[in-house]
């Protein structure tokens, strides 16, 4: 090697090696401080891209797991409301069995009907007001719930939100009870015929001293003859058409006795009679069966969501482990690298000092 002063080759080599060890020491310290093997794309471009895709999947699957938990919450909320509807239907069925008993009076039936109506109103209230995060789940406002359970498009689970109320269950009050309106019988009072004299001669019959008033009656007698009794004598009124005119009498009016006959008429009264329909219990059984079917579907979807969550969590764990192998720093390796490069730094610094002294040997030739 030529003895030169302008260029100190040994010093340059030593500086280069010192820079390398310093850079390696810096990388080791960075990895140890961050815990990551890849802190930028320059550390491992391909590994960084793979790890980034893993991160996207992990984040998406973690959110999908939370979505599935929300799906469980929706189905649990809906099932809880259906359970209360079922309780009301069970009570209505119990009351219907009671109402079918022949020992009940109309008052008893009315009392039973009152509670049934309240229970039916409560079913409709539960249907209309049960909601999850502002979404009504039983009113038919939203017929289907879609839950995103994957990281890609169309990775969803859908389940129906059945409309459950009195109409869809077929248990409206008129489906269980018949309400018939009947007319009460009426009593009559008022002057109809005032016969103060009665004469019979031979084969001819004469009626004198009779005052006749005309009354229009909407209805009819319930038998061919009506028997009136004042406590001592009976009076017979024949059910036949007759016309009384001056000089001419058509038809027959027969009286027994010679007392004033009075008729009074009150307006017919509407009476509502409640009867339990023959198929009321079958109707209620069908309604309970519909509620049970909806509840079973919700229970099944809860189990499905739980299985989905378990699978998502397993996938997240596996992807996290794979990403860790690519992205995370191995502390044993990095500590070893740091120690090695620290030694190289110390050695390089010492050697550089020696290399810088090499040109001094050239000066000895000039003495």
Curated annotation (Swiss-Prot):
It comes from the Bacteria. The keyword Chloroplast does not apply. The keyword Secreted applies. SUPFAM superfamilies: Phase 1 flagellin. InterPro entries: Flagellin, Flagellin_C, Flagellin_C_sub2, Flagellin_N. Induction: Although swimmer cells have only a few flagella, the elongated swarmer cells are profusely covered by thousands of new flagella synthesized specifically in response to growth on surfaces or in highly viscous liquids. GO terms for molecular function: structural molecule activity. One of its GO terms (cellular component) is extracellular region. Keywords: Bacterial flagellum, Secreted. Pfam families: Flagellin_C, Flagellin_N. It is found in: Secreted; Bacterial flagellum. Belongs to the bacterial flagellin family. Flagellin is the subunit protein which polymerizes to form the filaments of bacterial flagella. This is Flagellin 2. It comes from Proteus mirabilis.
